[in-house]
Amino acid sequence: SHSTWAQGDENTLSDTDDPDYVDDRSINGSLQIDEDIFNPGVGGIGNTSLDLNGSIGILNIGSFKTWTVAITGHTQNASSDDVITYNTGDIGTYKDKHHYYFFEGKLSFLDTNNEWFHDKSDNTLYVYPDYGDLSNRTIKGKTTDYSVTFSGAQYVTLKKINFFATTFEMTGNSDYNTVEECNFYYPSASKRMLGTTDGLGTPNVTELGSNADNNTIEKCLFENTEGEALVIKGDTNTIKNNYFHHIDWSASELQGLMVSIYCTGTSNIFQENTIHTTGASATVLPGRTSTFSYNKVTNTGLLQSDGAVFQGTKNYVQGSVVHHNFIYDTEKYAFRYDAPGGDATQAGSYGIMHHNIADNTNGLMIKGNNQIIAHNTILNTINNRNDIIILSEDCSNNSTYLYNNLAKRIGAHRSATSFSLTSDSPMPMAGNAGGSNYGYIKVSSSWRACQSGDSYYNATAGSGSSQNNIDEINVSRTGLTYNSDVESLLNYNSGDGKTESDYHPTSNTIIDQGVSPTTTPSNSGNYGGTGPALNNLVPHTNAGSAADIGAFEVGESWDTGADWSPKFYKVIWKTSAGSTAWNTASNWSTGVVPDADNNITIPAGASNMPVVSSSVSVKNLTVNSSATLTINSGVTLTVNGNLVNMGNITVNGEINVNN
């Protein structure tokens, strides 16, 4: 995550306090870097033994964009921040705050196990080994980006193949193909060690090209990529029941918006996938008229600022349907209908979000107009943000429908809860008591109702509404009811790990208290789903006399994410493990307790080192220097491959090595 990257900021001021604002200026290609960020082996940026000149810089200086540049100068200052220089032509969008970066590409930087350097001048490869004498070991290098290429292929099935350090691509008119039950281990990486020009910094990733339509990727594992997990440029493809984790450890020089899964085609379906531990700020850019459903996503956007799990930009909102997803424990927005540069009129419209759960995220951000936001449960939003934000800017969202949502805070502003013209806007939907049916606009420091002559004014009154929502803000608003503790209305217990069942309704305050609107929205044909009325666009079956408020009906159960157990290549004990228990899934990098098919690494630096308290089997086991492993009395640890112990293993029970 960013916590392990160096940091620094320019000393210029942003033109706005809008967190979505992007500054396209570059300050002469120079960057200040903090001296107190340390490199493990050489003492820190400020150490005169560390010269960054001639290195490769991976610079997250564009908020949600990261660039790979050649460092052309490094001025070391003993009493102040150092300055590095680079060619400004090597970067795109520049933002003057929240800078993170790391450097590589020099032999002198090698100081940690498994680091390597290639000297182009004499074609020599240097490796800092994890253990042992390299003369007795085999070192392999990646030579092929794509081991399988579909070119004009149709009705081909690729099934049960393990891809290691390679992947596939579909080009030409490759249609109706299936990739199923395949494992993609380290499928893509950049070639920037060879240089930063001619596209070497951009990884060649798993891709369905612009004329690859009606294909299916199902029940596959994608892990430890550099670059996007998937790029999809064709139409009506289905990405279903897959497992993605540890996606993109540099997030640099990616395509377009720079996301983890990049779609530009039309009518693609992304459903029942599990995603966790990603680098890029946004997780899924969906393409036009997409369906995003039954996905489970957590721990995203670790290497860039801004972002969302579902990132609906201007052209990708209309016709999108986002439903029955579970997003939790990420610093990013769970779902966002977005607009560039703070201009709400540039946002997309006619999107639908219904029956979603978000817990401990940056919430749900809705810009634009004519959106349908219904039956969502959004809790514990971070950064003092409102859980559901129906943004009231530039006369927008007055034709948006908001109903049967349960949240702690629902507002028209990112964080404010006053809902007054003199402070921050009232809720923008038409029909609000005492409000405007034409939306609101901010002039100087105050808000007012939109009127004829305003740049964003629409002479047709808004047709949206707010009905039967509940939150914890004790301020009167149409369609919103106050409750002091919404978690108490649910089967909520996050202490045992978050699951979908935590959000089942248990209180009569939300059971049978919803509405089932049959209104037909204006321009109903622009929505995805089976319209034209709201009850068709947002399908919902009542368990009782009326709809329940929130994502679930009482007695209803639905699950998200992949429904199978992946065969991970490597599983690492987390240095942030919350306990010493080997059999606790959250203590492992994959979020799953390892089994006999997995290669296990126990690293140094964990505050809780693993203890085996019941018999287990693994494939290969490596205990790094300064790491420990304890096997309790009466249990057996079986290693079916190689055991490499550079640390300390305490055996009170039994250990069997069957290599």
Language model features: what each stretch is:
Residues 1-204, 251, 463-466, 498-507, ...:
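Extracellular polysaccharide-degrading/modifying enzymes targeting complex plant/algal/animal polysaccharides
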Residues 87-97, 104-105, 131-154, 164-170, ...:
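Beta-propeller domains
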Residues 140-157, 165-175, 203-211, 231-232, ...:
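Extracellular beta-strand-rich solenoid/capping regions of secreted or surface-exposed proteins
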Residues 149-157, 175-178, 188, 203-216, ...:
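Surface-exposed loop/turn motifs in large extracellular/passenger domains
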Residues 166-170, 188-196, 202-205, 226-233, ...:
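Short glycine/acidic-rich loop motifs that flank beta-strands on beta-rich extracellular proteins
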Residues 342-507, 520:
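Predominantly extracellular beta-rich ligand-binding scaffolds that present long acidic/polar faces
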Residues 569-659:
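Extracellular beta-sheet-rich ligand-binding/adhesion modules
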